[in-house]
Swiss-Prot record:
Biased composition (Basic residues): 1030-1043
Region (Disordered): 1020-1043
Subunit: Part of the small subunit (SSU) processome, composed of more than 70 proteins and the RNA chaperone small nucleolar RNA (snoRNA) U3.
Function: RNA cytidine acetyltransferase with specificity toward both 18S rRNA and tRNAs. Catalyzes the formation of N(4)-acetylcytidine (ac4C) in 18S rRNA. Required for early nucleolar cleavages of precursor rRNA at sites A0, A1 and A2 during 18S rRNA synthesis. Catalyzes the formation of ac4C in serine and leucine tRNAs. Requires a tRNA-binding adapter protein for full tRNA acetyltransferase activity but not for 18S rRNA acetylation. Part of the small subunit (SSU) processome, first precursor of the small eukaryotic ribosomal subunit.
Natural source organism: Caenorhabditis elegans
Name the record gives this protein: RNA cytidine acetyltransferase
Amino acid sequence: MRTKLDGRIRTQIENGVASGHRSMFAVVGDKARDQVPILYHILSKSTVSARPNVLWCYKKELSFSTHRAKKAKKMKKATTTISGSLPDADPFDVFISSTQIRYCYYNETEKILGNTFGVLVLQDFEAMTPNLLARTIETIEGGGMVILLMQSVRSLRQLYTISMDVHNRYRTEAHNEITARFNERFILSLASCSSVLVLDDQLRVLPISSHIENVEAIPASQKKIQSESDAELASLKEAMKETKPIGPLLSRARTACQAKALLRFLDVITEKQSNVTCSLTAGRGRGKSAAVGLSLAGAIAFGYTNIFVTSPSPENLKTLFEFVVKGFDALDYQEHTDYELIQSANPEFKNCLVRINVFREHKQTIQYISPTDVQKLGQCELIVIDEAAAIPLPLVKELISGPYISFLSSTINGYEGTGRSLSLKLLQQLRQQSAGGEAKEGKSASNKGKTLHEMHMEESIRYKPGDKIEKWLNRLLCLDATNCQLKLECGTPPPAACELYIVNRDTLFSFHDASEAFLQQVMAIFVSAHYKNSPNDLQMLSDAPAHNLFVLMAPIDKSRKTIPEVLAVVQVCLEGRLDSDNIQNGLESGKRAAGDLLPWTVSQQFMDKQFGTLCGGRIVRVAVHPDYQSMGYGGRAVQLIEQYYLGLATSLDEEEKAPAPPSKTVIKQVKDGHTVELLEERIEPRADLPPLLQRLDERKPERLDYLGVSFGLTVPLLKFWKRNEFVPVYIRQNSNDITGEHTCIILKGLEHGGSDSDEEPSATWLPVYWREFRRRIVNLLSFDFSSFPAQMALSLLQLKNKHVEKQMKRLVIERSELAIHLSNTDLRRMSQYGRNMVDSHIITDILPIVAKLNFEQRLPQELKLAVTQSAILLARGLQHKHFEDISKELDLPMNQIFALLTKAIRRIGDWFDEVCETAVRENLDKEAEASAANKPTSSLPKAVPLANLEDELESAAKEIRARHDRDRKALLAELGNELQKYEIIQDEKELAEAYESVNMKYANKLVSVKSKRTAIQAAIPDAKDPANKNAKKKKRFSSGGRR
């Protein structure tokens, strides 16, 4: 039975083709698939170009055969019957066999990036996610259409409660009731767009689309009106028409934004300065890859020899290489004659282009490389990084650090969750380097001071400006949050005066005008303050039962009737309360359920199944308004959340309120017996909604045992959380593929009832976790964490939680344990180095041991080192960095590095010596006591000292002095008899006579005086006596005989 088609459908499609805008049709019913050929036929008749190609996305099964050969054979077999008549072929089979259709699984839609289609068909509504919507709809060109196939329902309100596949990820053991707020908002949004028609499976317009009761066709006169952008593009092409090779390349540009970007690229190429970086950012489908591809063709024309292109996958470079070839066509290059195309032999890349060899004038190459192949850029002259936001930031920094021109292109708006990292981190560092400043991290001598050219493209390449589907999608998924006005009029109130409110998610996602404005403001703060965002986060925030949203606001002026201004937004997820048996089974099997990130991770790392039974709150993100960052508002929000879950925010003036049940959306269930026909149903936002904001003292909180955070480890974030007394317990050894950061988990125990209460969660498990974490980090700093800045590593090992510090006992090392780590020779080497008697390489092997003992707090508190000394000891002893690297990192000269290390080693070495001396003294005392105890007992009384030590020493000194006097006198007496024989015995009278008889002027200073010898002198024989001489001679001859 044939029915007349609603004229609004045809008019809608024709208007889209005429204006270059897209149309969308949501078809509800079991036979919705059969209406696709009809809509496609209308579109193909309305266009003057070739039949549009189709992208058909589905979950698992298509429910029909896609084999074109079998379809053609079946149709040929059925063309004739026995009677010879020609039956009517199935329109759907004709459509499948005669149309260029690309079938794609939902989980493989990333492979369609950069492609353009005329028609999009989305089936399996329950498997769709916000990411899929944004990713697929943006591939449709202007004049095309999106067909959304929905299952048969009695009422559109049944779609509110439909179970989506993604909801399985949101369910946890403690929170398993899902409220599909996103579906309700999605259905309501369809009625807000004039380019969306909701139809049944007979192509009848449903009342939800009553806002477009009369669709007027676009007059022919308006179709020929040229926009300002088109006029600007035409003038640019005309101005550069005679300039080669720029003119022919510019003729391929489709928009004015693309033409300006291409001109900037070509200007940089013609200047041939190797210290230039160009950044091109835009939303999805703005023609970035096309502009880069045309610029590469221009680089070949200007004589560049070695050009490299990189991307997360070669499949993403299809459009880029396509426009390189189009650029060659514009420059009259002939394939096989002037250049050749090389496809990849890797089956994973599916015959993608990976190389273009040009040999028109000399050998030139455009080569694809993997982002990890930085070592292949030795002879590079120009490198292009397409979709740079999807490549880890450390790799991007390394790729652009060489002495060559760098082109970056990336999508910063749209569905990509990583696009903001390019603008928030990398481009900020490049701006600092371009301005002559030094980047905070990732500083390199080769890219320091590079000139940066930033370009941004606004106009879409696939459709004309003013596309209503784009506006609808941006509003639904908050994709244009970066363009939201964030200027606040509340000034800068003191953080202590600000208040925290909990947001009612039923009202927030109700699609009311006021709540939509508030939602856009919240998402704008999320996007501008946090670099990792995606539309899927929006669905998680709306539907996940364990998530709560808090906003920090300035004191509200009740006289104003505007939307409250938000200073900070905090998203909290409740986790834990797991069954211990489930945890044990998960730990043994290595599998875990979705959700509950902190309980599962901590339980697995510490092999503690009891931790998962606790109830905790994970702070998913803290986002502060970009104009109010680093002013204390983020810390104030965290402080208020802690007080809220401790029960300190509850009003004392009111009676105790019952615990607030989880927020639920009240949706009227539509049963078969009480259904409303689709053609009579009108869908509108609900009116019976609670207030959007609720004070904390109006809602009794859940009882939590801890608060936790999982974040990408950076120095500023670590300082922020430690300032709020959070304790790190886990760091992932593998870095994040996108940001290059290591995931860190930090916890803070909530002590209900104060420190005197018997319930002190942090008193039982958190100190144990911290001690174990500290021990692991000390050992891992020489492995996966050796690249950490010394400042970050030192901050990880410093505890700032007062409750945990009170329970931490410092286990000072003893002599017996010290001997296991350090020998006596090691201690002597330390002592010598501390006194500058040996070089530093003498103690290189000792530094890891000393550093480990220091940072594991095995040394006494009074031996605490200065911060700089600790950083040097950590960097050298634990991370094994070279002194040159330490000097650059700490910005200290080498002599100060050595001096500070020497002082630290001397202090520690002196304490080690003191420990050894004390141990020796104690051993001697013990031996003396043991020897005294082992002596046999006697009848004599026990000896008692008669005097103290000083008296004994004085007595001994007197005895020694007396002995010395006695020995001296004996020596003088012995020598005196021998010396008397040389004594001159004369009186003064004889001497005076001698002096008078001699003239002293001419004397030779000798005076002779006659004297008489004493008896002793007479006994001595005179050697001059002849008798004595003869006696000596006789004695000689008698002994020797004659000769």
